[in-house]
A protein has these predicted regions:
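Conserved helicase RecA-like core
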Residues: 1-278
Protein backbone atom coordinates (compact mmCIF):
# COMPACT_ATOMS: atom_id res chain seq x y z
CA UNK A 1 0.00 0.00 0.00
CA UNK A 2 1.14 3.55 -0.72
CA UNK A 3 2.21 5.67 2.24
CA UNK A 4 0.52 9.06 2.50
CA UNK A 5 3.37 11.45 3.11
CA UNK A 6 4.25 15.15 3.08
CA UNK A 7 7.72 16.34 2.10
CA UNK A 8 8.64 19.63 3.80
CA UNK A 9 11.89 21.17 2.56
CA UNK A 10 13.02 24.77 2.08
CA UNK A 11 13.74 24.61 -1.64
CA UNK A 12 10.08 23.84 -2.49
CA UNK A 13 7.24 26.37 -2.53
CA UNK A 14 5.37 26.46 0.75
CA UNK A 15 1.99 26.69 -1.03
CA UNK A 16 2.48 23.20 -2.46
CA UNK A 17 3.29 21.91 1.01
CA UNK A 18 0.23 23.56 2.53
CA UNK A 19 -1.95 21.63 0.07
CA UNK A 20 -0.23 18.38 1.09
CA UNK A 21 -0.75 19.05 4.80
CA UNK A 22 -4.46 19.73 4.32
CA UNK A 23 -4.82 16.08 3.31
CA UNK A 24 -3.77 15.11 6.87
CA UNK A 25 -0.88 12.88 5.92
CA UNK A 26 0.22 10.17 8.37
CA UNK A 27 3.93 10.69 7.73
CA UNK A 28 5.90 13.92 7.46
CA UNK A 29 9.48 13.99 6.15
CA UNK A 30 11.37 17.26 6.16
CA UNK A 31 14.26 19.48 7.12
CA UNK A 32 14.20 21.10 10.58
CA UNK A 33 13.99 24.66 9.24
CA UNK A 34 10.92 24.09 7.06
CA UNK A 35 9.17 21.91 9.67
CA UNK A 36 9.56 24.82 12.10
CA UNK A 37 8.11 27.20 9.51
CA UNK A 38 4.94 25.10 9.40
CA UNK A 39 4.77 24.72 13.18
CA UNK A 40 4.88 28.52 13.56
CA UNK A 41 2.18 28.90 10.87
CA UNK A 42 0.18 26.17 12.66
CA UNK A 43 -0.19 24.42 9.32
CA UNK A 44 1.49 21.40 10.93
CA UNK A 45 0.41 19.91 14.24
CA UNK A 46 2.49 17.29 16.03
CA UNK A 47 0.56 16.99 19.30
CA UNK A 48 -0.55 13.46 18.36
CA UNK A 49 2.77 12.28 16.92
CA UNK A 50 3.91 8.92 18.28
CA UNK A 51 7.18 8.43 16.43
CA UNK A 52 10.06 10.73 15.52
CA UNK A 53 13.11 9.78 13.47
CA UNK A 54 16.26 11.92 13.48
CA UNK A 55 18.29 10.76 10.49
CA UNK A 56 21.95 11.76 10.02
CA UNK A 57 21.76 13.59 13.34
CA UNK A 58 25.46 14.43 13.42
CA UNK A 59 25.22 16.10 10.03
CA UNK A 60 22.12 18.11 11.04
CA UNK A 61 23.93 19.38 14.14
CA UNK A 62 26.98 20.27 12.07
CA UNK A 63 24.72 22.30 9.77
CA UNK A 64 23.45 24.30 12.75
CA UNK A 65 20.04 22.65 13.13
CA UNK A 66 20.44 21.93 16.86
CA UNK A 67 18.18 24.80 17.99
CA UNK A 68 15.60 23.91 15.33
CA UNK A 69 15.50 20.28 16.53
CA UNK A 70 15.01 21.48 20.12
CA UNK A 71 12.03 23.60 19.03
CA UNK A 72 10.41 20.76 17.08
CA UNK A 73 10.68 18.30 19.96
CA UNK A 74 8.79 20.72 22.24
CA UNK A 75 5.73 20.30 19.98
CA UNK A 76 5.77 16.51 20.26
CA UNK A 77 4.28 14.56 23.22
CA UNK A 78 6.82 13.24 25.73
CA UNK A 79 5.32 9.78 25.36
CA UNK A 80 6.73 8.80 21.99
CA UNK A 81 9.30 6.57 20.36
CA UNK A 82 12.42 8.39 19.19
CA UNK A 83 14.88 6.86 16.74
CA UNK A 84 18.20 8.64 16.27
CA UNK A 85 20.54 7.60 13.45
CA UNK A 86 24.13 8.82 13.28
CA UNK A 87 27.27 7.56 11.56
CA UNK A 88 29.40 8.99 14.39
CA UNK A 89 28.86 9.76 18.07
CA UNK A 90 30.45 13.12 18.86
CA UNK A 91 29.79 14.83 22.20
CA UNK A 92 26.86 16.83 20.76
CA UNK A 93 25.02 13.61 19.88
CA UNK A 94 25.60 12.14 23.33
CA UNK A 95 24.19 15.30 24.97
CA UNK A 96 21.15 15.30 22.67
CA UNK A 97 20.44 11.63 23.37
CA UNK A 98 20.62 12.17 27.14
CA UNK A 99 18.24 15.10 26.83
CA UNK A 100 15.55 13.48 24.70
CA UNK A 101 15.90 9.69 24.90
CA UNK A 102 14.55 7.60 27.78
CA UNK A 103 16.45 4.38 28.56
CA UNK A 104 17.81 4.25 24.99
CA UNK A 105 19.28 1.14 23.41
CA UNK A 106 22.32 1.60 21.19
CA UNK A 107 22.50 -0.53 18.05
CA UNK A 108 25.68 -0.71 15.95
CA UNK A 109 25.39 -2.13 12.45
CA UNK A 110 28.17 -3.60 10.33
CA UNK A 111 31.94 -3.44 10.60
CA UNK A 112 33.22 0.12 10.60
CA UNK A 113 36.92 -0.62 10.99
CA UNK A 114 37.73 -2.22 7.63
CA UNK A 115 39.35 -0.46 4.67
CA UNK A 116 38.16 -1.86 1.33
CA UNK A 117 40.81 -3.95 -0.43
CA UNK A 118 40.30 -2.11 -3.72
CA UNK A 119 41.67 1.14 -2.23
CA UNK A 120 45.41 1.83 -2.47
CA UNK A 121 46.26 3.52 0.82
CA UNK A 122 49.39 5.63 1.35
CA UNK A 123 50.51 7.31 4.59
CA UNK A 124 52.94 10.24 4.54
CA UNK A 125 54.45 11.63 7.75
CA UNK A 126 55.28 15.27 7.20
CA UNK A 127 55.85 18.61 8.93
CA UNK A 128 52.69 20.68 9.18
CA UNK A 129 54.28 23.62 7.36
CA UNK A 130 55.17 21.38 4.39
CA UNK A 131 51.66 19.99 3.88
CA UNK A 132 50.41 22.47 1.31
CA UNK A 133 53.52 22.18 -0.86
CA UNK A 134 53.18 18.39 -0.85
CA UNK A 135 49.47 18.70 -1.64
CA UNK A 136 50.26 20.69 -4.79
CA UNK A 137 52.74 18.00 -5.83
CA UNK A 138 50.14 15.29 -5.25
CA UNK A 139 47.56 17.17 -7.33
CA UNK A 140 50.09 17.58 -10.14
CA UNK A 141 50.85 13.86 -10.15
CA UNK A 142 47.27 12.57 -9.93
CA UNK A 143 44.72 12.42 -12.71
CA UNK A 144 40.97 12.28 -12.26
CA UNK A 145 38.59 13.53 -9.60
CA UNK A 146 39.97 14.30 -6.14
CA UNK A 147 38.27 14.76 -2.76
CA UNK A 148 40.34 16.58 -0.11
CA UNK A 149 39.37 16.43 3.56
CA UNK A 150 40.16 19.21 6.03
CA UNK A 151 39.11 19.76 9.65
CA UNK A 152 36.89 22.84 9.55
CA UNK A 153 34.24 24.56 7.45
CA UNK A 154 36.42 27.67 7.24
CA UNK A 155 39.30 25.45 6.17
CA UNK A 156 37.37 24.18 3.14
CA UNK A 157 36.77 27.72 1.89
CA UNK A 158 40.37 28.80 2.50
CA UNK A 159 41.81 25.68 0.86
CA UNK A 160 39.56 25.90 -2.22
CA UNK A 161 40.48 29.57 -2.62
CA UNK A 162 44.21 28.84 -2.34
CA UNK A 163 44.03 25.94 -4.78
CA UNK A 164 42.08 27.98 -7.33
CA UNK A 165 44.73 30.70 -6.98
CA UNK A 166 47.34 28.04 -7.76
CA UNK A 167 45.43 27.00 -10.90
CA UNK A 168 43.65 23.95 -9.47
CA UNK A 169 39.93 24.60 -9.98
CA UNK A 170 38.15 23.52 -6.80
CA UNK A 171 35.04 24.12 -4.70
CA UNK A 172 34.34 23.83 -0.95
CA UNK A 173 31.65 21.57 0.51
CA UNK A 174 30.65 22.24 4.11
CA UNK A 175 27.66 22.43 6.43
CA UNK A 176 27.32 26.21 6.02
CA UNK A 177 26.26 25.93 2.38
CA UNK A 178 22.60 26.58 1.66
CA UNK A 179 20.85 23.60 0.11
CA UNK A 180 20.55 25.22 -3.33
CA UNK A 181 24.27 26.10 -3.31
CA UNK A 182 25.18 22.58 -2.19
CA UNK A 183 23.01 21.13 -4.99
CA UNK A 184 24.76 23.36 -7.55
CA UNK A 185 28.23 22.38 -6.32
CA UNK A 186 27.33 18.69 -6.33
CA UNK A 187 25.82 18.87 -9.82
CA UNK A 188 28.95 20.52 -11.23
CA UNK A 189 31.16 18.00 -9.45
CA UNK A 190 29.19 15.06 -10.85
CA UNK A 191 29.37 16.61 -14.32
CA UNK A 192 33.17 17.04 -13.89
CA UNK A 193 32.97 20.82 -14.31
CA UNK A 194 35.80 20.90 -11.73
CA UNK A 195 37.88 17.98 -10.49
CA UNK A 196 38.80 18.91 -6.91
CA UNK A 197 36.40 19.22 -3.99
CA UNK A 198 37.46 20.26 -0.48
CA UNK A 199 35.12 18.95 2.21
CA UNK A 200 34.52 18.40 5.90
CA UNK A 201 33.62 14.95 7.22
CA UNK A 202 29.97 15.72 7.92
CA UNK A 203 29.33 17.52 4.61
CA UNK A 204 30.72 14.58 2.63
CA UNK A 205 28.64 12.00 4.51
CA UNK A 206 26.80 9.73 2.10
CA UNK A 207 28.53 11.32 -0.88
CA UNK A 208 28.23 8.87 -3.77
CA UNK A 209 30.10 10.10 -6.83
CA UNK A 210 31.37 7.05 -8.76
CA UNK A 211 34.18 8.91 -10.52
CA UNK A 212 36.06 10.04 -7.36
CA UNK A 213 39.46 8.43 -7.95
CA UNK A 214 41.47 9.90 -5.09
CA UNK A 215 40.90 10.87 -1.46
CA UNK A 216 43.49 13.09 0.23
CA UNK A 217 43.37 13.41 4.02
CA UNK A 218 45.03 16.79 4.41
CA UNK A 219 43.97 16.86 8.08
CA UNK A 220 43.18 13.79 10.15
CA UNK A 221 39.53 13.42 11.21
CA UNK A 222 38.40 14.34 14.73
CA UNK A 223 36.84 10.89 15.12
CA UNK A 224 38.77 7.77 14.19
CA UNK A 225 35.65 6.22 12.62
CA UNK A 226 35.51 9.01 10.05
CA UNK A 227 38.77 7.75 8.55
CA UNK A 228 36.87 4.76 7.15
CA UNK A 229 34.01 6.97 5.92
CA UNK A 230 36.51 9.18 4.09
CA UNK A 231 38.24 6.34 2.29
CA UNK A 232 34.84 4.94 1.35
CA UNK A 233 34.23 7.94 -0.93
CA UNK A 234 36.61 6.40 -3.49
CA UNK A 235 36.69 2.90 -4.95
CA UNK A 236 32.93 2.90 -5.48
CA UNK A 237 31.26 -0.09 -7.16
CA UNK A 238 34.47 -2.16 -6.79
CA UNK A 239 36.52 0.24 -8.92
CA UNK A 240 40.14 0.90 -7.92
CA UNK A 241 40.50 3.90 -5.61
CA UNK A 242 43.45 5.73 -4.12
CA UNK A 243 43.91 7.44 -0.76
CA UNK A 244 46.79 9.38 0.75
CA UNK A 245 46.94 10.61 4.34
CA UNK A 246 49.20 13.38 5.66
CA UNK A 247 50.27 12.92 9.29
CA UNK A 248 52.10 15.73 11.09
CA UNK A 249 53.94 15.30 14.41
CA UNK A 250 51.03 16.92 16.29
CA UNK A 251 48.65 14.38 14.75
CA UNK A 252 50.58 11.26 15.78
CA UNK A 253 48.32 10.68 18.81
CA UNK A 254 45.22 10.83 16.62
CA UNK A 255 46.89 8.61 14.02
CA UNK A 256 47.60 6.00 16.72
CA UNK A 257 43.88 6.04 17.61
CA UNK A 258 43.03 5.35 13.97
CA UNK A 259 45.55 2.49 13.78
CA UNK A 260 44.12 0.91 16.94
CA UNK A 261 40.61 1.19 15.49
CA UNK A 262 41.80 -0.59 12.34
CA UNK A 263 43.70 -3.23 14.35
CA UNK A 264 42.54 -3.53 18.00
CA UNK A 265 45.44 -5.92 18.75
CA UNK A 266 47.75 -2.89 18.61
CA UNK A 267 46.10 -1.59 21.79
CA UNK A 268 47.15 -4.72 23.68
CA UNK A 269 50.71 -4.60 22.39
CA UNK A 270 50.97 -0.88 23.19
CA UNK A 271 49.71 -1.43 26.73
CA UNK A 272 52.23 -4.25 27.23
CA UNK A 273 55.04 -2.06 25.96
CA UNK A 274 54.06 0.84 28.21
CA UNK A 275 53.81 -1.54 31.18
CA UNK A 276 57.28 -2.96 30.63
CA UNK A 277 58.80 0.52 30.38
CA UNK A 278 57.25 1.80 33.59
Amino acid sequence: NAINMSCLIRREQITKQLKQLKRKQRTVVGTPDRINDHLIRKSLKLDRAKFIVLDETDRMLDMGFGIQIDRILKYIPKERQTLMFSATLPEQIVKLSKKYLTNPERVSIGKTNVVAQNINNEIIKIKKEDKYKLLLEQLDNREGTILIFVKTKHGTVKMAKNLSHDHFASEPLNGNLRQNKRDTVMRKFREKKFRIMVATDIAARGLDVPHIEHVINYDLPQLAEDYIHRLGRTGRANSIGSAVTFVSSKELGKWNEIQIMLDPSLKKSNSKNSFSKS
